[in-house]
Structure formats: structure tokens, C-alpha cells
Amino acid sequence: MNEQKTNDLILQTATKLVSFIILLFSFYLFLSGHNAPGGGFVGGLITSSSIVLLLLAYDLKTVRSLLPVNFIYVAGAGLLLAVLTGVGSFVFGAPFLTHTFGYFQLPILGKTELATATIFDLGVYLVVVGITMTIIQTIGEEE
């Protein structure tokens, strides 16, 4: 039986643009998460959905060449970052996962709030992206 080669030029071209927009939205949700709905979990899921869109438009081999990352290591790094953020409060004699924040004057952004909760959210973000992509790639692999 001959396999018919499909022409997915429109899907692949649209995916490049849409994936970028989805990643920007994911970044926005990640940064607004401590003041509004969003954060590391939702941002990570949306980032994973962007990568899944790439997997649908292209194939697993192409996406792996674009993102040569072992996602299980991404999840491990995120878990380590989240735990270290929580343990870091012990250094200051505070309970586990006690967070603090401060306002800093940054060159282009002006007065900006920087919080340790953002570092914890980054850990959650990495764990969610790592685990969801590991599961999806494992399911999508050929035997």
C-alpha cells in the first residue's frame, strides 16, 4: 500500500505564528499569576499546548530537532527549583515556603515588584512542561 504524502504547508505556516502567540500568552499568564488568575501551572499547560501544536503540524523527529531537550530533566530541574525556593526560607528562620517580595527600580521597566513566589512558580512551570511533554512524547513514540 502506498502512503500518500500530504501537503501541510498551510498548517505548518499557521502553526509557526500561532505557536508564538500561544507562548507569549503563556508568558503573560506566568508573570501575572501572583496577582491574577494564572501562574506556573496554567502557564506550563499552555506552553505544553503550544509544543503539542508543533507536534501536530510537524512530526516528533522534527520537533525533537527543534527542541533537543529531554523533558524529564526539565521536570527535575523545576522540582529542584521549587523545593530550593521553599527551603531557602529556612536560611532566614522562617517556615517552609515563606515568601517575600520587594520593589526595585529596573532600567526599562521602572519600579517593579520582584517576589520569591515567582521563582517558585517558575519551578512549577518547568515541572508541568516537563511532565506533560514527557507523557505526550512517550505516548506519541513509535515502538
UniProtKB/Swiss-Prot annotation:
Instruction: Report the Pfam families cross-referenced here.
Output: MnhB
Q: Where in the cell is it found?
A: Cell membrane
Q: Which GO terms describe its cellular component?
A: plasma membrane
Q: Which residues cross the membrane?
A: 9-31, 36-58, 71-93, 117-139
Q: Which UniProt keywords apply?
A: Antiport, Cell membrane, Hydrogen ion transport, Ion transport, Membrane, Sodium, Sodium transport, Transmembrane, Transmembrane helix, Transport
What does the record list as GO biological process? proton transmembrane transport; sodium ion transport
Example GO molecular function term? antiporter activity
Annotated membrane topology: Multi-pass membrane protein
Q: Keyword Ligase: yes or no? A: no
- Family (UniProt): Belongs to the CPA3 antiporters (TC 2.A.63) subunit B family.
Q: What else is known?
A: Mrp-dependent antiport apparently occurs by a secondary, proton motive force-dependent mechanism, but the similarity of several Mrp proteins to membrane-embedded subunits of energy-coupled NADH dehydrogenase complexes raises the possibility that there is a capacity for electron transport that could provide a primary energy coupling option for Mrp functions.
Query: Can you state the subunit structure given in the record?
Result: Forms a heterooligomeric complex that consists of seven subunits: MrpA, MrpB, MrpC, MrpD, MrpE, MrpF and MrpG.
What is its biological role? Mrp complex is a Na(+)/H(+) antiporter that is considered to be the major Na(+) excretion system in B.subtilis. Has a major role in Na(+) resistance and a minor role in Na(+)- and K(+)-dependent pH homeostasis as compared to TetB. MrpA may be the actual Na(+)/H(+) antiporter, although the six other Mrp proteins are all required for Na(+)/H(+) antiport activity and Na(+) resistance. MrpA is required for initiation of sporulation when external Na(+) concentration increases. Also transports Li(+) but not K(+), Ca(2+) or Mg(2+).
Protein name per UniProt: Na(+)/H(+) antiporter subunit B
Q: Which organism is it from?
A: Bacillus subtilis (strain 168)
